[in-house]
């Protein structure tokens, strides 16, 4: 028998018909997983009648990277409205910042309170 002509080659390639060379090649399609933005949380500072205003400004500068003017503005909001937003963060970061603020307030014997709220 002579060489096979292109018309006589089976669709899956040359072979003797016993399936040795009939390899099905396919593409595995994985469902796309959609990444979501994490939920964000506001860190809120609550007013009290005992924590010095300068301490509140210091906390805002130290833990929330606020300038003196920004910190003073937030401190006045807390003082006048009873609550102020220190920043918006992912849950873990917000929780960590609340802990840092509360620890420093306790070390300095201030009753300052911070909490988180879903944004």
UniProtKB/Swiss-Prot annotation:
Q: Which GO BP terms, alphabetically? A: protein catabolic process; proteolysis
Q: Which residues does the annotated region (Disordered) include? A: 1-24
- Which Pfam families does the UniProt record give? ClpS
Q: What job does the chain carry out?
A: Involved in the modulation of the specificity of the ClpAP-mediated ATP-dependent protein degradation.
Q: Which family does it belong to?
A: Belongs to the ClpS family.
Quaternary structure and partners: Binds to the N-terminal domain of the chaperone ClpA.
What PANTHER family does this protein map onto? Answer: ATP-DEPENDENT CLP PROTEASE ADAPTER PROTEIN CLPS, ATP-DEPENDENT CLP PROTEASE ADAPTER PROTEIN CLPS1, CHLOROPLASTIC
What name is this protein filed under?
A: ATP-dependent Clp protease adapter protein ClpS
The record lists the organism as Gluconobacter oxydans (strain 621H) (Gluconobacter suboxydans)
Q: Which gene encodes it?
A: clpS
């Amino acid at each position: 028998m002579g060489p096979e002509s292109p018309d006589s080659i089976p669709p899956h390639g040359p072979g003797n018909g016993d399936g040795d060379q009939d390899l099905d090649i396919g593409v595995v399609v994985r469902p796309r997983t959609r990444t979501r933005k994490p939920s964000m949380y506001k860190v809120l500072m609550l007013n009290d009648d005992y924590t010095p205003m300068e301490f509140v400004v210091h906390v805002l500068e130290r833990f929330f990277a606020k300038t003196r003017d920004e910190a003073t503005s937030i401190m006045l909001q807390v003082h006048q409205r009873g609550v102020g937003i220190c920043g918006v963060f992912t849950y873990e970061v917000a929780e960590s910042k609340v802990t840092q603020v509360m620890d420093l307030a306790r070390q300095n014997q201030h009753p300052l309170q911070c909490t988180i709220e879903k944004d």
